[in-house]
Regions:
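C-terminal regulatory/interaction regions
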Residues: 240-303
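Divalent-metal (often Zn2+) His-rich catalytic cores of metallo-beta-lactamase-fold enzymes
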Residues: 80, 198-251
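Metal-dependent catalytic neighborhoods of phosphoester/phosphodiester hydrolases
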Residues: 71-80, 96-97
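Divalent metal-coordination and catalytic microenvironments
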Residues: 24, 34, 44, 65, ...
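Metallo-beta-lactamase
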Residues: 37-39, 57-69, 93-147, 153-221
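Conserved beta-strand hairpin/beta-sheet module of binuclear metal-dependent hydrolase folds
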Residues: 1-55, 158-167
């Protein structure tokens, strides 16, 4: 299938095929979906240079959401001229990222700088707040954002010429190993929400994309399998929670149980240790354990 975009591999933490940026050419320069984290700016520069471009050629960056692996370099690119398109709930945190960075610091601790690098604020005049289904027209490119919470409340998937750039609501699926039909859900705190994710999945189905392109790491043309896999994972996660959480495990105990659950799925799908490491780099199990614990306590424990 022919596409009007290019996949740029940011080689996050020296692990290929874990974080992508998607590049589009138009008559006045380049547009990107995602910026990647600040730590991968050198990899982004290398990819641009190989194509004869510089940071100054980037006119627009469309963010699926503001988590550091997707939006961390947006401020850097904005200061070199790019307009940053973002969900209205996420926009204030791009301009004033102190709360976002404090929250991330609680999660990542001493690993913050190594993993994510510098997160610069985006100048307010470089932020374009985008509403649900409001077309973004850049030269001869037209993108349509779809409000798709579940991974985060401020999440957009973008439709472009029948292709869905699904951010994280489309799951994590890496083109590695012997089996590329393996999908995991990234479920971080504080905004993972099972029911909202189900509603977003319905919306993705209704969009009827011809291909689906998760940030971790596309594209894929077996759209029906992919969307069905998301639904199976949501069902499996709910079953896991209902089996495990009534005993009120600590987050550490929950993480151990979730690790075992993930390894069982690896065995089922024939996932080798190197591929598992790549999945853990893109979507660490310990982070999902924290997200699941928070979701259960806030939304399910009192039911």
């Amino acid at each position: 299938m022919a596409y009007r975009f290019e996949v740029l591999d940011l080689n996050f933490q020296n692990v290929p095929h874990t974080i992508a940026v998607y590049l589009f050419r138009h008559d006045k320069g380049l547009a990107l979906i995602e910026s990647g984290p600040g730590s991968t700016v050198p990899a982004l520069e290398k990819a641009l240079t190989a194509r004869g471009f510089t940071f100054g050629d980037i006119t627009d960056v469309l963010l699926t959401h503001i988590h550091l692996d997707h939006a961390g370099a947006a401020g850097f690119l904005a200061r070199r001229g790019a307009t940053i398109h973002v969900h209205p709930v996420g926009a204030p945190h791009m301009i004033h990222p102190e709360k976002l960075l404090k929250s991330a610091g609680r999660i990542y601790g001493d690993m913050m700088d190594t993993l994510w690098g510098e997160f610069l604020p985006v100048p307010e005049e470089k932020v374009h707040v985008v509403q649900d289904e409001e077309d973004i027209v850049i030269g001869d490119l037209r993108f349509t954002p779809l409000d798709t919470p579940g991974h985060a409340y401020h999440h957009y998937a973008y439709m472009f010429e029948g292709v869905c750039f699904s951010g994280d609501v489309g799951g994590v699926r890496l083109p590695l190993g012997n089996n590329t039909r393996h999908l995991r859900l990234p479920m971080p705190p504080p905004e993972f929400h099972l029911e909202k994710w189900r509603a977003s999945l319905t919306r993705l189905r209704e969009a009827a994309p011809r291909a689906i392109v998760p940030t971790h790491f596309g594209p894929y043309e077996d759209v029906n399998w992919h969307l069905d896999a998301i639904e199976r994972e949501l069902d499996d996660v709910e079953g896991f929670l209902e089996a495990v959480m009534p005993s009120q495990p600590s987050v550490e105990e929950l993480e151990r149980k979730l690790d075992g659950w993930v390894l069982e799925k690896n065995q089922r799908d024939g996932i080798d240790p190197e591929t598992h490491h790549a999945y853990e780099t893109a979507n660490p199990t310990w982070m999902s354990a924290s997200g699941l614990a928070r979701y259960w306590k806030k939304f399910r424990q009192s039911q």
